[in-house]
Amino acid sequence: MRKLSPYGRKLLQRQQTQDRQQAERDFFAAVQRDVRGLQIDAGLHCWTGNNAGTMVNTCGRLLYIVAFAANAAGVSPDHPDMRIMRGMSEALGDLADDLDAIERHRASIQSGLGAIDRLLPLCTLVALLEGSYELEQRLNSVRGMGTQDVRELIGVAA
């Protein structure tokens, strides 16, 4: 291996720094793209879909991630959009229990998606990433995830 001159080491360090920064930008862009894709899927299923199971899955995933990120951003549990998300959580829980009641809960879920749209600018990418990681951990656990988990994130005791 050839020994580098001080100038060569400096160029190598600069290139490694640029590569690391580009990798971080690409990673955060992928997180943004995934959250945006989940948001679009949830909106499509909520507004036009008739598959209640898919609606519960996509909307519930988005709800958990944004509730986690909003909680990390310090949004008050009494914030109107957090209350709307709490109602969305209850509607998704009821819909999961009775998949035939899709029209009864559609308006609450649509309102919750609007609240999510308003809360997303307050959330950091790191918090969204942590929320998606926490969601996957909960879904892969034995206990799973339910309405109570979202209520705890929003700041409401059982």
Regions found by a protein language model. Name each.
Residues 67-120, 127:
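Long, low-complexity or tandemly repetitive, helically biased scaffold regions used
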Residues 23-30, 34, 58, 87, ...:
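Charge-rich, solvent-exposed alpha-helical interaction surfaces
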Residues 100-158:
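Amphipathic alpha-helical binding modules
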Residues 1-4:
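BZIP DNA-binding basic region
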Residues 10-73, 154:
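Short terminal alpha-helical segments
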Residues 19, 26, 34, 41, ...:
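Acidic-enriched, low-complexity/disordered segments with a strong bias for Aspartate over Glutamate
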